[in-house]
């Protein structure tokens, strides 16, 4: 009998999984005195929304304490924790079974030890051929109606990414699978042209990369994002881009052309100025210094650029708000927005695992503040508050951000894009030219 690698261990017996209990709170835990902020570049920061400091909300209870201890027990279990050598250069520290899978996988020691170390997990690119490429959005707190995701998953490996749970739709984990199994859509530009030619199509700003970073490392090879921009430029179609990659500067030639026609704006996500923290949170994204340099290059090229301080993680990077905004303003950013940490579905457990690995002494404090801002829960998906939270801590974060943004002139919200220039792409006839 030949020895099997540890990453190919047999499955244990199926373990039944309970259905998800994530439901929106019908009351929303909203007070008219609490601030509401949006990370969107189109949403104004309303000074009048800041009222008196809200009363203290729910505190860190017994359920939360048990969740913290459960995370510690999980990370002490070698059948759950992925070995450090295997996840070198990755953000997630675990790879739990997808929430829609009927059975839960658990590793076990079969006695076939191997002496050599297993190599780090490679990135696998899976080609996907979707039938459509524009996704419609009807969430009232998201100020774009359409989006395009050139990829599924993201190699940047940001530990906090709210899009991680979407990998469950592919039967995969929101942990390491999300950053090692990337789905690429090479026919995206072709589909986009077809959809823009539809007789009933109405142009509105398309968000490029709502659930993935359009300039993640695999874009260097596949160039799907650039092909999409080429179509949008020819059609004079407005687009908004969110990225934390310096690769966006590769397309300055296209973006400059679109900026001249008021068709593009770019938001650079900057979560910290500390390179050590960045390596832990977002190991394959550009360094903070590189992102600030990207802001400078885009601004000097005449491309409207804003900065997103997103997410703000209690007790981890919340002390950097003012410093990030100041550095961004000096680099040439024109606007700024923020989002409080969001932990939908199994992301809450992934975040606890990450904290146990990197900041075990802060685990309880992080979730104490987060639950205070989420009505006593790890996450509240209520549309009116999911971006900014509620309660005293959320109020304080909003007030600090607004004050700094106003002082630095980053609260103008003046990057409106044109849609009146749109012209549908010409339909190819399939006939050869005579000349």
Sequence positions of predicted segments:
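Short histidine/acidic/glycine/proline-rich micro-motifs that form metal-
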Residues: 213-215, 311-315, 387-388
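C-terminal accessory regions of radical SAM enzymes
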Residues: 349, 355-433
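Conserved Radical SAM active-site core
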Residues: 110, 116-152, 156-267, 271-279, ...
């Amino acid at each position: 009998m030949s020895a099997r690698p540890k990453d190919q261990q047999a499955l244990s017996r199926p373990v039944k999984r309970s259905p998800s209990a994530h439901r929106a709170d019908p009351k929303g835990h909203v007070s008219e005195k609490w601030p509401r902020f949006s990370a969107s570049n189109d949403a104004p920061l309303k000074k009048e929304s800041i009222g008196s400091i809200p009363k203290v909300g729910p505190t860190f209870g017994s359920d939360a304490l048990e969740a913290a201890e459960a995370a510690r027990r999980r990370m002490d279990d070698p059948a759950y924790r992925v070995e450090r050598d295997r996840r070198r250069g990755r953000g997630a520290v675990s790879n739990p079974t997808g929430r829609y899978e009927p059975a839960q996988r658990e590793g076990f020691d079969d006695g076939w030890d191997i002496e050599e170390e297993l190599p780090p997990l490679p990135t696998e690119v899976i080609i996907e051929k979707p039938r459509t490429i524009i996704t419609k959005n009807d969430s009232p707190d998201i100020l774009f109606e359409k989006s395009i995701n050139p990829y599924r998953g993201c190699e940047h490996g940001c530990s906090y990414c709210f899009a991680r749970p979407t990998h469950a739709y592919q039967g995969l984990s929101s942990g390491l699978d999300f950053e090692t199994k990337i789905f690429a859509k090479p026919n995206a530009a072709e589909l986009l042209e077809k959809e823009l030619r539809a007789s009933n199509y109405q142009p509105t700003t398309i968000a490029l990369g709502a659930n993935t970073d359009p300039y993640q490392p695999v874009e260097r090879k596949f160039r799907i994002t650039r092909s999409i921009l080429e179509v949008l430029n020819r059609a004079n179609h407005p687009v908004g881009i969110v990225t934390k990659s310096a690769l966006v500067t590769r397309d300055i030639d296209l973006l400059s052309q679109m900026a001249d026609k008021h068709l593009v704006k770019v938001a650079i996500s900057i979560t910290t100025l500390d390179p050590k923290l960045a390596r832990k949170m977002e190991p394959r994204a550009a360094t903070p210094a590189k992102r600030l340099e990207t802001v400078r290059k885009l601004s000097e090229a005449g491309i409207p650029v804003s900065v997103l301080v997103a997410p703000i993680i209690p007790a981890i990077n919340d002390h950097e708000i003012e410093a990030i905004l100041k550095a961004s303003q000096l680099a040439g950013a024109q606007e700024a927005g923020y989002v409080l940490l969001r932990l939908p579905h199994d992301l809450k457990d992934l975040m606890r695992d990450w904290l146990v690995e990197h900041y075990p002494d802060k685990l309880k404090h992080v979730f104490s503040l987060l639950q205070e801002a989420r009505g006593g829960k790890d996450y509240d998906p209520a549309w009116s508050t999911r971006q900014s939270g509620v309660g005293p801590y959320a109020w304080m974060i909003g007030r600090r951000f607004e004050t700094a943004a106003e002082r630095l002139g980053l609260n103008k919200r003046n990057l409106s894009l044109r849609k009146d220039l749109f012209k549908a792409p010409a339909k190819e006839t399939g006939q050869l030219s005579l000349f």
